[in-house]
Amino acid sequence: MEFENLTKEEMEQLQKIYDDTISFERKIGIIIPTIFAVIILVGLVGNALVVIVAFGRQMRNSTNTLIIGLAISDLMFLLLCVPFTAVDYAAPTWIFPEWTCSMINFFQHTSAYCSVWTLTLMALDRYLAVVYPVESMTLRTPRNTVIALCFIYIIIIASQIPVGRMHGIYVYDFIMEKRSTCAILTIATAEATPTMARTYFMTFNVFGYVLPLGISVVLYGLMLRKLWDMPRPGNSQSVGGRNLTNRDSGSSIRRRPEATAAKRKVTRLVLCVLITWALCWLPLNVCFFMSGLAYPEPLVISHGVIMVIVQIASQVLAYTNSCLNPILYALMSQSFREGFIRVMKMLINKLSRGRFCTNYRRSALRTELTHYNQTPAHPANTVVQVSNGERSSLLKDNSSSATSVQPLRTSIQAKKTKNIGRSKSTRSYNL
């Protein structure tokens, strides 16, 4: 950027704008990565617990298979997208290789599409379970669910390859310095026609939000009408021309309200997951839609700094959705809640047991060294016996000799070598 023709007042104004922008970016560069770090931590732990619990033998059904697929999509998003975006907020330039720009945006779009279409499959699964409970039993199996997920994921992956290839590192002038970021090059340089740009933005709006959400809303509407017509416990039913309550009817009728109540609980959980997703992704989709309408003029130019804050907040809200589903499962599903507690107890027991064993080995080693130091250099009738490094004892043996100290030295040296090797192997994983 040329500054020779600027007056002193213009240079002062430009310097003030630059200083204010840098100050704002520094604050954002601390706040947003911190929020993303919390999202990553909560999301990784929560979704990993969901996968572990849902893989249990007693939890194997079509709905939980879809929940596993949704958790895997969130894990992919948390591992391959959020960390790079956090660094991008903290650094003024793109510090990663160029291929990472394409990879991140490919996985970001893929995981977003996989999540929403998995939610649509969950709505279809609930619809079949409620409206056609008997007819759909052979169709709603974990195996068929995995086949449906793979079919949809293959289509999504194939369709998002061009989106990944469209992205690259865009270098631009920013007041007094050069910067770079990851963006769609044809849109960032305004080389794309308005039709091309709007096609990109609105394709995501339609196939990544409006269409799957619309299908899910229709399915839930039909499902809720069916659930509303189902009898509740204690209501009278007509059987054989006379009215019977659920208590004095046959066993199959008695069991029907309990099964209906269970279906209502599962349907309520899946519906809450869908509503949460829709609310979290709505602001970002609105920003996408407005960006398509405003192209080639950026929204920041037409709406000012307030639009920057809105775009950042909408992105943070969309990313937050990746860690909310496990919280909903824990709050609304007793089976998941009990599974989470069971897995956490198991992990805590293993960690505490491992810490106890480590402390026990250290104590045993100190005891051996103490006995060794207190033992005469040439004992006449004492043998130090060590059993696997776990305990030591002094046993009297008239047939022992001074050479019995050598195995102890060998054992201590072996322990030191083992600990050093363990330390090196552990350090090698700290990349």
UniProtKB/Swiss-Prot annotation:
Cytoplasmic topological segments: 56-66, 125-143, 225-268, 320-431
SMART domains: 7TM_GPCR_Srsx
Gene3D superfamilies attached to this UniProt entry: Rhodopsin 7-helix transmembrane proteins (1.20.1070.10)
Keyword Hydrolase: no
Tissues in which the UniProt entry reports expression: Exclusively expressed in the AIB interneuron.
Pfam families xrefs: 7tm_1
Gene Ontology annotations of biological process type: foraging behavior; G protein-coupled receptor signaling pathway
Residue stretches of biased makeup (Basic residues): 415-425
Protein topology in the membrane: Multi-pass membrane protein
Biased amino acid composition, Polar residues: 235-252, 393-414
Signal peptide limits: none
Parts forming coiled coils: none
Alphabetical list of InterPro entries matching this protein: Galanin_rcpt, GPCR_Rhodpsn, GPCR_Rhodpsn_7TM
Region (Disordered): 235-257, 393-431
SUPFAM superfamilies, sorted: Family A G protein-coupled receptor-like
Disruption phenotype: Decreased roaming in response to food during the L3 and L4 stages of larval development and adult stages, but not at the L1 stage of larval development. Increased lipid accumulation.
Role played: Neuropeptide that controls movement such as roaming, foraging and backwards locomotion or 'reversals' in response to environmental cues such as food availability or volatile odorants such as octanol. Antagonizes AIB interneuron activity to control bacterial colonization and may negatively regulate the expression of immunity-related genes such as pqm-1 and dod-22 in response to infection by P.aeruginosa.
Sequence similarity: Belongs to the G-protein coupled receptor 1 family.
Entry protein name: Galanin-like G-protein coupled receptor npr-9
Organism: Caenorhabditis elegans
